[in-house]
Protein backbone atom coordinates (compact mmCIF):
# COMPACT_ATOMS: atom_id res chain seq x y z
CA UNK A 1 0.00 0.00 0.00
CA UNK A 2 1.23 3.50 -0.86
CA UNK A 3 2.60 5.39 2.16
CA UNK A 4 0.52 8.45 1.24
CA UNK A 5 -2.67 6.39 1.36
CA UNK A 6 -1.70 4.95 4.74
CA UNK A 7 -0.94 8.40 6.17
CA UNK A 8 -4.16 9.87 4.76
CA UNK A 9 -6.33 7.07 6.17
CA UNK A 10 -4.67 7.15 9.57
CA UNK A 11 -4.79 10.94 9.78
CA UNK A 12 -8.51 10.94 8.98
CA UNK A 13 -9.13 8.30 11.63
CA UNK A 14 -7.07 10.19 14.18
CA UNK A 15 -8.65 13.58 13.48
CA UNK A 16 -12.15 12.08 13.55
CA UNK A 17 -11.36 10.36 16.86
CA UNK A 18 -10.00 13.55 18.47
CA UNK A 19 -13.03 15.57 17.36
CA UNK A 20 -15.66 13.02 18.37
CA UNK A 21 -14.11 11.28 21.38
CA UNK A 22 -11.69 13.69 23.04
CA UNK A 23 -11.84 17.44 22.51
CA UNK A 24 -15.35 18.65 21.63
CA UNK A 25 -18.35 18.53 23.98
CA UNK A 26 -21.85 17.36 23.07
CA UNK A 27 -24.70 19.80 22.50
CA UNK A 28 -27.06 17.48 24.43
CA UNK A 29 -25.37 17.06 27.82
CA UNK A 30 -22.42 19.47 27.49
CA UNK A 31 -19.84 16.82 28.37
CA UNK A 32 -16.72 15.52 26.70
CA UNK A 33 -16.38 11.70 26.91
CA UNK A 34 -14.02 11.77 29.92
CA UNK A 35 -16.37 14.07 31.83
CA UNK A 36 -19.38 11.88 31.01
CA UNK A 37 -17.52 8.79 32.22
CA UNK A 38 -16.58 10.48 35.50
CA UNK A 39 -20.21 11.42 36.16
CA UNK A 40 -21.29 7.87 35.24
CA UNK A 41 -18.78 6.42 37.73
CA UNK A 42 -20.07 8.71 40.47
CA UNK A 43 -23.65 7.63 39.74
CA UNK A 44 -22.50 4.00 39.94
CA UNK A 45 -20.69 4.54 43.23
CA UNK A 46 -23.31 6.79 44.81
CA UNK A 47 -24.33 5.84 48.33
CA UNK A 48 -24.72 9.30 49.81
CA UNK A 49 -21.17 9.36 51.20
CA UNK A 50 -18.02 11.04 49.94
CA UNK A 51 -15.64 8.87 47.91
CA UNK A 52 -11.88 9.14 47.58
CA UNK A 53 -11.08 10.75 44.25
CA UNK A 54 -8.50 8.00 43.73
CA UNK A 55 -11.32 5.42 43.87
CA UNK A 56 -13.47 7.43 41.46
CA UNK A 57 -10.53 7.71 39.06
CA UNK A 58 -9.91 3.97 39.33
CA UNK A 59 -13.54 3.14 38.63
CA UNK A 60 -13.63 5.54 35.67
CA UNK A 61 -10.67 3.75 34.10
CA UNK A 62 -13.07 0.89 33.31
CA UNK A 63 -14.60 3.25 30.74
CA UNK A 64 -11.78 5.62 29.79
CA UNK A 65 -8.68 4.16 28.09
CA UNK A 66 -6.32 7.13 28.61
CA UNK A 67 -4.76 6.79 32.03
CA UNK A 68 -5.47 8.13 35.48
CA UNK A 69 -3.88 11.59 35.11
CA UNK A 70 -6.32 12.81 32.46
CA UNK A 71 -9.26 11.50 34.52
CA UNK A 72 -8.00 13.15 37.72
CA UNK A 73 -7.45 16.52 36.02
CA UNK A 74 -10.88 16.38 34.35
CA UNK A 75 -12.57 15.50 37.67
CA UNK A 76 -10.90 18.42 39.47
CA UNK A 77 -11.93 20.71 36.60
CA UNK A 78 -15.60 19.62 36.78
CA UNK A 79 -15.62 19.83 40.58
CA UNK A 80 -14.35 23.41 40.48
CA UNK A 81 -17.35 24.39 38.35
CA UNK A 82 -19.42 23.87 41.56
CA UNK A 83 -22.32 22.38 39.65
CA UNK A 84 -22.48 18.56 39.72
CA UNK A 85 -19.68 17.48 42.07
CA UNK A 86 -19.48 18.33 45.76
CA UNK A 87 -15.89 18.66 47.02
CA UNK A 88 -14.20 17.74 50.28
CA UNK A 89 -10.55 18.64 50.71
CA UNK A 90 -8.13 20.79 48.73
CA UNK A 91 -9.24 20.93 45.09
CA UNK A 92 -6.85 23.77 44.33
CA UNK A 93 -7.41 27.51 44.31
CA UNK A 94 -9.13 29.09 41.32
CA UNK A 95 -7.68 32.49 42.21
CA UNK A 96 -4.04 31.64 42.89
CA UNK A 97 -3.73 28.71 40.49
CA UNK A 98 -2.51 26.40 43.27
CA UNK A 99 -3.04 22.74 42.25
CA UNK A 100 -5.35 20.25 43.96
CA UNK A 101 -4.01 17.75 46.48
CA UNK A 102 -3.21 14.21 45.37
CA UNK A 103 -6.25 12.06 44.57
CA UNK A 104 -5.77 9.93 47.71
CA UNK A 105 -6.29 12.95 49.96
CA UNK A 106 -9.45 14.50 48.48
CA UNK A 107 -13.03 13.26 48.26
CA UNK A 108 -16.13 13.99 46.22
CA UNK A 109 -19.73 13.01 45.58
CA UNK A 110 -22.56 14.07 43.30
CA UNK A 111 -24.71 17.08 44.13
CA UNK A 112 -28.52 16.87 44.27
CA UNK A 113 -28.58 18.97 41.07
CA UNK A 114 -26.88 16.12 39.18
CA UNK A 115 -29.76 13.81 40.10
CA UNK A 116 -32.36 16.47 39.29
CA UNK A 117 -31.14 17.30 35.78
CA UNK A 118 -28.89 14.44 34.58
CA UNK A 119 -29.90 11.13 36.13
CA UNK A 120 -32.69 9.26 34.39
CA UNK A 121 -31.40 5.73 33.99
CA UNK A 122 -34.44 4.27 32.25
CA UNK A 123 -34.39 6.74 29.36
CA UNK A 124 -30.58 6.96 29.06
CA UNK A 125 -29.13 5.11 26.07
CA UNK A 126 -26.10 2.98 26.94
CA UNK A 127 -23.33 1.58 24.77
CA UNK A 128 -20.48 -0.85 25.35
CA UNK A 129 -17.28 0.52 26.84
CA UNK A 130 -14.02 0.43 24.89
CA UNK A 131 -13.24 -3.17 25.97
CA UNK A 132 -16.81 -4.48 25.80
CA UNK A 133 -16.90 -5.43 29.49
CA UNK A 134 -19.15 -2.62 30.71
CA UNK A 135 -21.87 -0.27 29.53
CA UNK A 136 -21.59 3.50 29.62
CA UNK A 137 -24.05 6.27 28.68
CA UNK A 138 -23.95 7.42 25.08
CA UNK A 139 -25.33 10.79 26.26
CA UNK A 140 -27.06 12.00 29.40
CA UNK A 141 -30.64 13.27 28.94
CA UNK A 142 -29.72 16.67 30.40
CA UNK A 143 -32.67 18.89 31.26
CA UNK A 144 -30.66 22.14 31.27
CA UNK A 145 -28.05 23.64 28.86
CA UNK A 146 -25.04 22.35 30.81
CA UNK A 147 -22.60 23.53 28.15
CA UNK A 148 -23.63 27.18 28.55
CA UNK A 149 -23.48 27.06 32.34
CA UNK A 150 -20.13 25.26 32.64
CA UNK A 151 -18.45 26.50 29.49
CA UNK A 152 -15.95 24.39 27.59
CA UNK A 153 -12.67 24.60 25.74
CA UNK A 154 -11.11 22.13 23.35
CA UNK A 155 -8.65 21.97 20.47
CA UNK A 156 -9.16 19.30 17.81
CA UNK A 157 -7.66 18.77 14.37
CA UNK A 158 -8.47 21.82 12.27
CA UNK A 159 -10.98 23.26 14.73
CA UNK A 160 -11.28 24.63 18.25
CA UNK A 161 -14.09 25.33 20.69
CA UNK A 162 -14.12 28.16 23.21
CA UNK A 163 -17.39 28.46 25.12
CA UNK A 164 -17.61 30.84 28.07
CA UNK A 165 -19.51 30.01 31.28
CA UNK A 166 -22.85 31.70 31.92
CA UNK A 167 -25.02 32.26 34.97
CA UNK A 168 -27.19 29.29 36.04
CA UNK A 169 -30.23 31.44 36.88
CA UNK A 170 -30.01 33.50 33.69
CA UNK A 171 -29.72 30.40 31.48
CA UNK A 172 -32.76 28.76 33.09
CA UNK A 173 -34.73 31.99 32.82
CA UNK A 174 -33.75 32.18 29.14
CA UNK A 175 -35.08 28.65 28.53
CA UNK A 176 -38.26 29.68 30.34
CA UNK A 177 -38.53 32.82 28.18
CA UNK A 178 -38.07 30.69 25.05
CA UNK A 179 -40.93 28.43 26.17
CA UNK A 180 -43.09 31.50 26.82
CA UNK A 181 -42.13 33.12 23.52
CA UNK A 182 -40.47 36.08 25.25
CA UNK A 183 -37.22 37.83 24.29
CA UNK A 184 -34.00 37.40 26.27
CA UNK A 185 -30.28 38.18 26.20
CA UNK A 186 -27.55 35.95 27.60
CA UNK A 187 -24.04 37.09 28.51
CA UNK A 188 -21.07 35.36 30.21
CA UNK A 189 -20.63 35.14 33.97
CA UNK A 190 -17.20 34.15 35.29
CA UNK A 191 -16.35 32.41 38.58
CA UNK A 192 -13.53 34.92 39.10
CA UNK A 193 -15.90 37.90 38.83
CA UNK A 194 -14.48 40.96 37.10
CA UNK A 195 -16.07 43.27 34.55
CA UNK A 196 -17.08 42.22 31.03
CA UNK A 197 -17.88 44.25 27.91
CA UNK A 198 -20.22 42.19 25.70
CA UNK A 199 -20.66 44.65 22.80
CA UNK A 200 -18.91 42.27 20.40
CA UNK A 201 -20.14 38.97 21.89
CA UNK A 202 -22.13 38.24 18.69
CA UNK A 203 -24.48 35.71 20.33
CA UNK A 204 -21.61 33.50 21.46
CA UNK A 205 -19.30 33.67 18.43
CA UNK A 206 -17.54 37.02 18.77
CA UNK A 207 -15.32 38.26 21.58
CA UNK A 208 -15.56 39.88 24.99
CA UNK A 209 -13.34 42.36 26.79
CA UNK A 210 -12.74 41.36 30.42
CA UNK A 211 -11.27 43.55 33.16
CA UNK A 212 -10.12 43.02 36.71
CA UNK A 213 -12.04 44.86 39.40
CA UNK A 214 -9.68 47.49 40.80
CA UNK A 215 -10.33 49.63 43.88
CA UNK A 216 -8.51 52.74 45.06
CA UNK A 217 -7.85 52.73 48.82
CA UNK A 218 -6.15 56.13 48.63
CA UNK A 219 -4.17 58.04 46.00
CA UNK A 220 -1.10 55.90 46.75
CA UNK A 221 -2.69 52.44 47.15
CA UNK A 222 -4.53 50.29 44.60
CA UNK A 223 -6.13 46.89 45.36
CA UNK A 224 -7.19 44.35 42.71
CA UNK A 225 -10.31 42.60 44.07
CA UNK A 226 -11.45 40.39 41.16
CA UNK A 227 -9.59 38.74 38.28
CA UNK A 228 -10.26 38.54 34.55
CA UNK A 229 -11.47 35.07 33.48
CA UNK A 230 -8.58 32.67 32.93
CA UNK A 231 -6.09 34.69 34.98
CA UNK A 232 -4.62 33.80 38.37
CA UNK A 233 -3.02 36.09 40.92
CA UNK A 234 0.35 34.66 39.90
CA UNK A 235 -0.11 35.33 36.18
CA UNK A 236 -1.54 38.79 36.86
CA UNK A 237 1.32 39.80 39.17
CA UNK A 238 3.80 38.47 36.60
CA UNK A 239 2.27 40.71 33.91
CA UNK A 240 2.44 43.72 36.27
CA UNK A 241 6.10 43.03 37.04
CA UNK A 242 6.82 42.79 33.31
CA UNK A 243 5.19 46.19 32.74
CA UNK A 244 7.26 47.65 35.58
CA UNK A 245 10.49 46.32 34.07
CA UNK A 246 9.58 47.91 30.73
CA UNK A 247 8.95 51.21 32.56
CA UNK A 248 5.31 51.34 31.41
CA UNK A 249 4.05 51.78 34.96
CA UNK A 250 5.66 52.73 38.27
CA UNK A 251 4.86 50.66 41.38
CA UNK A 252 6.96 50.62 44.54
CA UNK A 253 5.68 47.30 45.94
CA UNK A 254 3.24 44.45 45.19
CA UNK A 255 1.67 42.43 48.03
CA UNK A 256 -0.60 39.43 47.45
CA UNK A 257 -3.05 39.00 50.35
CA UNK A 258 -5.33 36.60 48.46
CA UNK A 259 -7.08 33.95 50.57
CA UNK A 260 -10.79 33.26 50.11
CA UNK A 261 -11.02 36.47 48.10
CA UNK A 262 -8.58 38.16 45.74
CA UNK A 263 -6.54 41.01 47.23
CA UNK A 264 -3.46 42.20 45.32
CA UNK A 265 -2.21 45.48 46.81
CA UNK A 266 -0.08 47.87 44.75
CA UNK A 267 1.77 50.69 46.52
CA UNK A 268 2.80 53.67 44.39
CA UNK A 269 6.02 55.74 44.62
CA UNK A 270 6.34 59.51 45.06
CA UNK A 271 4.93 61.56 42.23
CA UNK A 272 2.73 58.72 40.95
CA UNK A 273 -1.01 58.59 41.68
CA UNK A 274 -3.68 55.90 41.50
CA UNK A 275 -5.84 57.67 38.90
CA UNK A 276 -3.08 57.61 36.28
CA UNK A 277 -1.86 54.07 37.07
CA UNK A 278 -5.21 52.23 36.84
CA UNK A 279 -5.68 52.98 33.12
CA UNK A 280 -2.12 51.84 32.46
CA UNK A 281 -2.76 48.59 34.34
CA UNK A 282 -5.61 47.86 31.94
CA UNK A 283 -3.47 48.59 28.88
CA UNK A 284 -0.08 47.17 29.79
CA UNK A 285 -0.97 44.16 31.99
CA UNK A 286 -3.41 41.26 32.08
CA UNK A 287 -5.81 43.35 34.15
CA UNK A 288 -7.64 43.64 30.82
CA UNK A 289 -7.81 40.82 28.27
CA UNK A 290 -9.81 40.06 25.15
CA UNK A 291 -11.33 36.57 24.79
CA UNK A 292 -12.49 35.28 21.41
CA UNK A 293 -15.23 32.65 21.51
CA UNK A 294 -16.38 29.89 19.17
CA UNK A 295 -19.51 27.92 20.04
CA UNK A 296 -18.50 24.62 18.44
CA UNK A 297 -20.28 21.45 19.65
CA UNK A 298 -21.01 17.90 18.55
CA UNK A 299 -24.51 17.22 17.27
CA UNK A 300 -25.16 13.58 16.39
CA UNK A 301 -21.38 13.05 16.27
CA UNK A 302 -20.79 15.93 13.83
CA UNK A 303 -19.19 19.31 14.72
CA UNK A 304 -21.62 22.24 14.42
CA UNK A 305 -21.17 25.94 15.23
CA UNK A 306 -24.16 27.23 17.21
CA UNK A 307 -25.29 30.58 18.58
CA UNK A 308 -26.51 31.14 22.13
CA UNK A 309 -30.09 31.45 20.93
CA UNK A 310 -29.74 28.25 18.87
CA UNK A 311 -28.75 26.40 22.04
CA UNK A 312 -31.53 27.90 24.14
CA UNK A 313 -34.10 26.89 21.49
CA UNK A 314 -32.60 23.41 21.24
CA UNK A 315 -32.69 22.87 25.01
CA UNK A 316 -36.21 24.29 25.38
CA UNK A 317 -37.39 21.63 22.92
CA UNK A 318 -35.08 19.00 24.44
CA UNK A 319 -36.42 19.68 27.96
CA UNK A 320 -39.99 19.10 26.79
CA UNK A 321 -38.92 15.91 25.01
CA UNK A 322 -37.12 14.48 28.08
CA UNK A 323 -39.88 15.43 30.52
CA UNK A 324 -42.48 13.89 28.21
CA UNK A 325 -40.45 10.66 28.03
CA UNK A 326 -40.25 10.57 31.83
CA UNK A 327 -43.98 11.23 32.14
CA UNK A 328 -44.76 8.49 29.63
CA UNK A 329 -42.54 6.14 31.64
CA UNK A 330 -44.35 7.08 34.86
CA UNK A 331 -47.66 6.62 33.08
CA UNK A 332 -46.76 3.11 31.92
CA UNK A 333 -45.66 2.18 35.46
CA UNK A 334 -48.90 3.47 37.00
CA UNK A 335 -50.99 1.73 34.34
CA UNK A 336 -49.13 -1.48 35.17
CA UNK A 337 -49.83 -1.00 38.87
CA UNK A 338 -53.52 -0.33 38.20
CA UNK A 339 -53.66 -3.34 35.89
CA UNK A 340 -52.14 -5.72 38.40
CA UNK A 341 -54.16 -4.40 41.37
CA UNK A 342 -57.35 -4.74 39.29
CA UNK A 343 -56.34 -8.22 38.16
CA UNK A 344 -55.53 -9.24 41.72
CA UNK A 345 -58.82 -7.86 43.05
CA UNK A 346 -60.90 -9.66 40.42
CA UNK A 347 -58.97 -12.89 41.05
CA UNK A 348 -59.77 -12.72 44.76
CA UNK A 349 -63.11 -10.84 44.81
CA UNK A 350 -64.67 -13.11 42.15
CA UNK A 351 -63.19 -16.14 43.95
CA UNK A 352 -61.46 -17.32 40.78
CA UNK A 353 -58.73 -18.78 42.99
CA UNK A 354 -61.22 -21.39 44.25
CA UNK A 355 -61.20 -23.00 40.80
CA UNK A 356 -57.78 -24.34 41.71
CA UNK A 357 -59.54 -26.84 43.99
CA UNK A 358 -61.50 -28.31 41.05
CA UNK A 359 -58.71 -28.59 38.46
CA UNK A 360 -57.20 -32.06 38.39
CA UNK A 361 -54.53 -31.60 35.72
CA UNK A 362 -51.69 -29.12 36.24
CA UNK A 363 -51.35 -28.34 32.53
CA UNK A 364 -54.92 -27.00 32.50
CA UNK A 365 -54.49 -24.53 35.34
CA UNK A 366 -53.20 -21.58 33.28
CA UNK A 367 -55.78 -21.87 30.51
CA UNK A 368 -58.74 -22.29 32.88
CA UNK A 369 -57.75 -19.37 35.13
CA UNK A 370 -56.96 -17.18 32.08
CA UNK A 371 -60.32 -17.87 30.46
CA UNK A 372 -62.10 -17.05 33.71
CA UNK A 373 -60.14 -13.80 34.13
CA UNK A 374 -60.87 -12.78 30.54
CA UNK A 375 -64.58 -12.73 31.33
CA UNK A 376 -63.74 -9.37 33.00
CA UNK A 377 -61.41 -8.06 30.28
CA UNK A 378 -63.25 -4.72 30.06
CA UNK A 379 -61.79 -3.92 33.49
CA UNK A 380 -58.21 -4.13 32.23
CA UNK A 381 -56.10 -1.47 30.49
CA UNK A 382 -54.21 -4.02 28.44
CA UNK A 383 -54.32 -7.63 27.32
CA UNK A 384 -53.96 -10.27 30.06
CA UNK A 385 -51.00 -12.54 29.35
CA UNK A 386 -50.07 -15.98 30.65
CA UNK A 387 -47.23 -14.35 32.61
CA UNK A 388 -49.82 -12.28 34.48
CA UNK A 389 -51.74 -15.44 35.42
CA UNK A 390 -48.53 -17.06 36.61
CA UNK A 391 -48.01 -14.08 38.95
CA UNK A 392 -51.54 -14.57 40.29
CA UNK A 393 -50.84 -18.21 41.04
CA UNK A 394 -47.84 -17.15 43.13
CA UNK A 395 -50.01 -15.18 45.59
CA UNK A 396 -49.78 -16.86 49.03
CA UNK A 397 -52.98 -18.17 50.64
CA UNK A 398 -52.28 -15.93 53.63
CA UNK A 399 -52.37 -12.80 51.43
CA UNK A 400 -55.61 -13.97 49.79
CA UNK A 401 -57.26 -14.49 53.18
CA UNK A 402 -56.13 -11.05 54.42
CA UNK A 403 -56.87 -9.19 51.16
CA UNK A 404 -58.67 -5.88 51.82
CA UNK A 405 -60.91 -5.08 48.84
CA UNK A 406 -61.78 -1.59 50.09
CA UNK A 407 -58.12 -0.64 50.59
CA UNK A 408 -57.21 -2.01 47.17
CA UNK A 409 -60.05 -0.01 45.57
CA UNK A 410 -58.79 3.14 47.30
CA UNK A 411 -55.26 2.45 46.05
CA UNK A 412 -56.58 2.09 42.50
CA UNK A 413 -58.49 5.35 42.90
CA UNK A 414 -55.33 7.15 44.05
CA UNK A 415 -53.38 5.69 41.14
CA UNK A 416 -56.08 6.82 38.68
CA UNK A 417 -55.83 10.31 40.15
CA UNK A 418 -52.05 10.26 39.58
CA UNK A 419 -52.63 8.98 36.07
CA UNK A 420 -55.02 11.83 35.36
CA UNK A 421 -52.42 14.34 36.58
CA UNK A 422 -49.73 12.75 34.40
CA UNK A 423 -52.00 12.81 31.34
CA UNK A 424 -52.73 16.46 32.04
CA UNK A 425 -48.99 17.22 32.24
CA UNK A 426 -48.34 15.35 28.99
CA UNK A 427 -51.06 17.29 27.19
CA UNK A 428 -49.64 20.60 28.49
CA UNK A 429 -45.96 19.69 28.39
CA UNK A 430 -44.87 23.30 27.82
CA UNK A 431 -46.48 24.48 31.05
CA UNK A 432 -45.11 21.44 32.88
CA UNK A 433 -41.60 22.30 31.60
CA UNK A 434 -41.94 25.90 32.79
CA UNK A 435 -43.03 24.64 36.21
CA UNK A 436 -40.00 22.31 36.28
CA UNK A 437 -37.67 25.28 35.65
CA UNK A 438 -39.40 27.30 38.38
CA UNK A 439 -38.83 24.45 40.85
CA UNK A 440 -35.12 24.30 39.93
CA UNK A 441 -34.78 28.07 40.37
CA UNK A 442 -36.55 27.98 43.72
CA UNK A 443 -34.21 25.23 44.89
CA UNK A 444 -30.84 26.41 43.54
CA UNK A 445 -30.99 30.09 42.55
CA UNK A 446 -29.45 31.38 45.80
CA UNK A 447 -26.29 29.35 45.13
CA UNK A 448 -25.76 30.86 41.68
CA UNK A 449 -25.82 34.66 41.89
CA UNK A 450 -24.09 36.63 39.11
CA UNK A 451 -20.43 37.39 39.87
CA UNK A 452 -19.35 39.34 36.78
CA UNK A 453 -20.53 42.89 36.18
CA UNK A 454 -21.63 43.75 32.63
CA UNK A 455 -20.40 47.20 31.60
CA UNK A 456 -19.33 49.20 28.56
CA UNK A 457 -15.54 49.47 28.75
CA UNK A 458 -14.25 52.72 27.27
CA UNK A 459 -10.59 52.10 26.63
CA UNK A 460 -8.22 54.97 26.05
CA UNK A 461 -5.77 54.81 23.19
CA UNK A 462 -2.53 53.32 24.47
CA UNK A 463 -0.67 56.35 23.08
CA UNK A 464 -2.74 58.64 25.28
CA UNK A 465 -1.64 56.99 28.51
CA UNK A 466 1.97 56.24 27.58
CA UNK A 467 4.43 57.34 30.26
CA UNK A 468 7.07 59.87 29.26
CA UNK A 469 9.84 57.84 30.83
CA UNK A 470 12.67 58.64 28.37
CA UNK A 471 14.94 61.71 28.46
CA UNK A 472 15.98 62.84 24.97
CA UNK A 473 19.22 64.71 24.26
CA UNK A 474 20.49 66.54 21.16
CA UNK A 475 23.97 67.29 19.85
CA UNK A 476 23.17 69.55 16.89
CA UNK A 477 26.79 70.16 15.97
CA UNK A 478 27.62 66.45 15.69
CA UNK A 479 24.21 65.57 14.23
CA UNK A 480 23.10 63.06 16.88
CA UNK A 481 19.98 62.71 19.06
CA UNK A 482 18.87 60.00 21.51
CA UNK A 483 18.37 58.85 25.08
CA UNK A 484 22.02 57.90 25.73
CA UNK A 485 23.56 61.11 24.36
CA UNK A 486 24.44 62.64 27.71
CA UNK A 487 26.95 65.15 26.30
CA UNK A 488 24.14 66.82 24.37
CA UNK A 489 21.42 69.31 25.24
CA UNK A 490 18.30 67.98 26.97
CA UNK A 491 15.32 68.63 24.66
CA UNK A 492 12.47 66.90 26.51
CA UNK A 493 10.86 63.80 28.01
CA UNK A 494 9.28 61.30 25.64
CA UNK A 495 7.22 58.11 25.62
CA UNK A 496 7.80 55.03 23.49
CA UNK A 497 5.33 56.39 20.91
CA UNK A 498 6.81 59.90 20.56
CA UNK A 499 9.23 60.88 17.75
CA UNK A 500 12.20 63.16 17.16
CA UNK A 501 11.19 65.92 14.72
CA UNK A 502 14.22 67.18 12.76
CA UNK A 503 13.95 70.48 10.83
CA UNK A 504 16.36 71.18 7.99
CA UNK A 505 16.43 74.35 5.86
CA UNK A 506 13.90 73.12 3.32
CA UNK A 507 12.44 69.90 4.79
CA UNK A 508 11.65 67.94 7.93
CA UNK A 509 11.74 64.27 8.96
CA UNK A 510 10.41 62.33 11.98
CA UNK A 511 12.53 59.57 13.47
CA UNK A 512 12.05 56.93 16.17
CA UNK A 513 13.62 57.69 19.52
CA UNK A 514 16.58 55.38 20.09
CA UNK A 515 19.70 55.32 22.24
CA UNK A 516 21.66 57.27 19.61
CA UNK A 517 20.40 58.28 16.17
CA UNK A 518 22.29 60.18 13.46
CA UNK A 519 20.08 63.02 12.22
CA UNK A 520 22.58 64.82 9.93
CA UNK A 521 24.64 67.91 10.71
CA UNK A 522 22.79 70.35 8.46
CA UNK A 523 19.80 70.88 10.72
CA UNK A 524 17.99 73.98 11.90
CA UNK A 525 16.67 72.33 15.05
CA UNK A 526 15.38 69.05 16.52
CA UNK A 527 12.65 68.56 19.10
CA UNK A 528 10.45 65.88 20.68
CA UNK A 529 7.24 65.35 18.71
CA UNK A 530 4.50 64.46 21.23
CA UNK A 531 2.28 61.92 19.50
CA UNK A 532 -0.78 63.17 21.39
CA UNK A 533 -0.31 66.95 21.49
CA UNK A 534 2.06 68.00 18.70
CA UNK A 535 -0.54 67.45 15.99
CA UNK A 536 -1.98 70.84 16.93
CA UNK A 537 1.43 72.55 17.08
CA UNK A 538 1.88 75.28 14.44
CA UNK A 539 5.31 75.55 12.83
CA UNK A 540 6.25 78.95 11.38
CA UNK A 541 8.84 79.50 8.60
CA UNK A 542 10.21 82.70 7.00
CA UNK A 543 11.74 82.19 3.58
CA UNK A 544 13.04 84.34 0.69
CA UNK A 545 11.99 83.67 -2.89
CA UNK A 546 14.89 84.33 -5.28
CA UNK A 547 12.63 84.76 -8.33
CA UNK A 548 10.62 87.74 -7.08
CA UNK A 549 13.00 88.87 -4.28
CA UNK A 550 10.26 88.91 -1.64
CA UNK A 551 10.06 87.44 1.87
CA UNK A 552 7.23 85.06 2.81
CA UNK A 553 5.79 83.51 5.98
CA UNK A 554 4.48 79.95 5.87
CA UNK A 555 2.61 78.33 8.79
CA UNK A 556 1.57 74.65 8.88
CA UNK A 557 0.83 71.68 11.15
CA UNK A 558 2.28 68.17 11.08
CA UNK A 559 -0.64 65.85 11.81
CA UNK A 560 0.17 62.96 9.47
CA UNK A 561 3.52 61.45 8.67
CA UNK A 562 5.51 58.34 7.87
CA UNK A 563 8.56 57.74 10.04
CA UNK A 564 11.89 58.43 8.27
CA UNK A 565 10.19 59.97 5.23
CA UNK A 566 11.54 63.41 4.21
CA UNK A 567 8.86 66.08 3.73
CA UNK A 568 9.87 69.24 1.83
CA UNK A 569 8.21 72.54 2.73
CA UNK A 570 10.33 74.91 0.52
CA UNK A 571 10.87 74.88 -3.23
CA UNK A 572 14.21 74.96 -5.09
CA UNK A 573 13.99 78.78 -5.54
CA UNK A 574 13.23 79.36 -1.86
CA UNK A 575 15.84 80.23 0.71
CA UNK A 576 15.31 79.47 4.42
CA UNK A 577 15.46 82.54 6.71
CA UNK A 578 13.97 81.79 10.14
CA UNK A 579 12.01 79.16 12.07
CA UNK A 580 9.89 79.42 15.24
CA UNK A 581 7.34 77.38 17.19
CA UNK A 582 5.38 80.09 18.97
CA UNK A 583 6.23 83.56 17.62
CA UNK A 584 4.11 86.59 18.42
CA UNK A 585 5.26 88.88 15.60
CA UNK A 586 7.11 89.00 12.32
CA UNK A 587 9.64 91.84 12.62
CA UNK A 588 11.28 93.37 9.54
CA UNK A 589 13.27 96.47 8.54
CA UNK A 590 13.10 98.35 5.25
CA UNK A 591 15.93 99.86 3.22
CA UNK A 592 15.22 103.10 5.05
CA UNK A 593 15.89 101.30 8.37
CA UNK A 594 12.27 101.55 9.42
CA UNK A 595 11.41 98.61 11.71
CA UNK A 596 7.88 97.22 11.54
CA UNK A 597 5.96 94.37 13.14
CA UNK A 598 3.04 92.25 11.94
CA UNK A 599 1.13 90.02 14.36
CA UNK A 600 1.58 86.34 13.57
CA UNK A 601 -2.19 85.76 13.45
CA UNK A 602 -2.31 87.78 10.23
CA UNK A 603 -0.69 84.81 8.52
CA UNK A 604 -3.04 81.87 7.92
CA UNK A 605 -2.18 78.26 8.74
CA UNK A 606 -2.01 76.25 5.52
CA UNK A 607 -0.45 73.02 4.32
CA UNK A 608 3.33 72.52 4.19
CA UNK A 609 3.31 72.48 0.35
CA UNK A 610 1.31 75.71 -0.06
CA UNK A 611 2.83 79.11 -0.92
CA UNK A 612 3.39 81.38 2.07
CA UNK A 613 2.02 84.90 2.51
CA UNK A 614 4.23 87.76 1.34
CA UNK A 615 5.33 90.05 4.18
CA UNK A 616 5.67 93.35 2.26
CA UNK A 617 5.78 94.66 -1.30
CA UNK A 618 8.88 96.68 -0.42
CA UNK A 619 12.42 95.44 -0.49
CA UNK A 620 13.43 94.44 3.04
CA UNK A 621 16.80 94.33 4.68
CA UNK A 622 16.13 92.00 7.64
CA UNK A 623 13.25 89.73 8.62
CA UNK A 624 12.86 87.56 11.75
CA UNK A 625 10.36 86.19 14.27
CA UNK A 626 9.81 87.79 17.64
UniProtKB/Swiss-Prot annotation:
GO molecular function, one term: DNA binding
Topology in the lipid bilayer: Peripheral membrane protein
Entry GO terms, CC: cytoplasm; DNA topoisomerase type II (double strand cut, ATP-hydrolyzing) complex; plasma membrane
Superkingdom of the organism of origin: Bacteria
Positions annotated as active site in the UniProt record: 105 (o-(5'-phospho-dna)-tyrosine intermediate)
Functional summary from the UniProt entry: Topoisomerase IV is essential for chromosome segregation. It relaxes supercoiled DNA. Performs the decatenation events required during the replication of a circular DNA molecule.
Name under which the protein is recorded: DNA topoisomerase 4 subunit A
Organism per entry: Borreliella burgdorferi (strain ATCC 35210 / DSM 4680 / CIP 102532 / B31)
